[in-house]
Structure formats: C-alpha cells, structure tokens
C-alpha cells in the first residue's frame, strides 16, 4: 500500500505506506538514479487515473487523496 495525500489545509503532503509500498517507491527512485539518460521522470497513479502504483484508500479522513504524482530527476549532486 502506498497512498499520497494532502492534509486538510493543503499545505502538507503525507506519504503513507506499508513495506511493499515503500519498497516500490524506493525501486522507482532507484530506477531514476540509475538511468538518467533514459528516464528523467516517473508517474505514480491510482487505478482511477490508469495506474497501479498508488492506493485509493485514504488513510486520514480529513485528507485529500492525490491521484497522480510525477517524480522528476534533474541530475547532479
């Protein structure tokens, strides 16, 4: 499970994950780091948005679910 939410005020991003979900996020980040010449970004989406990387199960009732996250790799140190 990997769920990304915005708090009630919309100024804090919360990442909720179990072992599998956080390991999947780590793997996506590692792919970006290992192949920057081939991959400079990655999409994480809920099933409602055509993906399977993010869960649609809100973990805090007052939060808003994020359906699409785009990770960008800009290289460098």
Give each language-model segment a name:
Residues 1-77:
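Positively charged, low-complexity terminal tracts
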